[in-house]
Amino acid sequence: MIKHLIKNVSNSVKYNNVTSNNILFSTSSSLKFGRKFTTETQQECILERLEGENKGISVISFNRGHVKNALGKNLMNQFRSHLNELRFCPDTRVVIVRSLVDGVFCSGADLKERALMSQVEASQFVHSLRSSFTELETLQMPTIAAIEGVAVGGGTEMVLACDFRVASKSSKMGLPETGLAIIPGAGGTQRLPRLIGIPRAKELIFTGAILDSKRALEIGLVQYETEKGEAFDKAIEIAKQIIPKGPIAIRMAKQAIDRGMNVDQASGMIIEQASYAQVIPTKDRIEGLTAFKEKRKPIYKGE
């Protein structure tokens, strides 16, 4: 088991040398910290790679306004494609997920589309949601959900897969699936109790309660609450605090925490040891020591 844990940790850093040339680049007019903007593409899910003072941040934006960003096949196909690009993009140090649609982050699954599916097709679609959110969760760089408006059902399950959740005072979150005689099927029954505890998770899922941002903050469902329209601003602020840090160290820290939470503490210590071993031979570690000695800010390159 120990050899297996160490091998998994070692393999996880090999992607650093892989590059991607398919990521969309943003323009200065396309991002004014969460303000709605126009774009030439008609994509329902848009990936941007920010530049200038926000370099290192990539943003996934949902733009399916006519159905309140409901999760349909086309949107999810685009979402998965963007996640695949980000997974092999060493220049991206933080990912922010947000909505471009006023008043809604994500209203959950597209139930009208779901009604046209056979039982097999419906099961396949739920499986694709579950696997997509796991892909989001296992991105090696930190992820931040900037929540404005409604984020229920699959919308809540999506933000649960992020490392940080920032909710504006316009936000509404919850898992109302039992009211439709189903259960959360894209990770909600597993991630929610791990985040807020079993009793509270059962209460929210059994009752289908919808929470405002204040209550979500109180129970630890989100880490930050902002004024309406400012969730993306806060997400950018958090991202800019992370970006100057050693990118390999950030990835290894995330890996050690995430993997360690799913095993006993002794095994978690082995994961931490193996993760720490990955940062020792890096150029960034030497740069950090040199910068400290020279009393200057370090410049980390992810090497």
From Swiss-Prot:
GO biological process, any: fatty acid beta-oxidation
Q: How does it assemble?
A: Homohexamer.
Annotated localization: Mitochondrion
EC code(s) of this entry: 4.2.1.18
Q: Lyase among the record's keywords?
A: yes
Principal subcellular localisation of the protein: mitochondrion
Under which pathway is this protein filed?
Amino-acid degradation; L-leucine degradation; (S)-3-hydroxy-3-methylglutaryl-CoA from 3-isovaleryl-CoA: step 3/3
Question: At the top level of its lineage, which domain of life is listed?
Answer: Eukaryota
Record family assignment: Belongs to the enoyl-CoA hydratase/isomerase family.
Task: Cite the InterPro entries for this sequence.
Answer: ClpP/crotonase-like_dom_sf, Enoyl-CoA_hyd/isom_CS, Enoyl-CoA_hydra/iso, Enoyl-CoA_hydra_C
What Gene Ontology terms describe what this protein does at the molecular function level? Answer: enoyl-CoA hydratase activity; methylglutaconyl-CoA hydratase activity; mRNA 3'-UTR binding
What's in the keyword line of the UniProt record? Answer: Branched-chain amino acid catabolism, Lyase, Mitochondrion, Transit peptide
Protein name from the UniProt record = Methylglutaconyl-CoA hydratase, mitochondrial
Q: What class of enzyme is it?
A: lyase
Task: State its role.
Answer: Catalyzes the conversion of 3-methylglutaconyl-CoA to 3-hydroxy-3-methylglutaryl-CoA.
Q: Which reaction does it catalyse?
A: (3S)-3-hydroxy-3-methylglutaryl-CoA = 3-methyl-(2E)-glutaconyl-CoA + H2O
Q: Which Gene Ontology terms of cellular component type are present?
A: mitochondrion
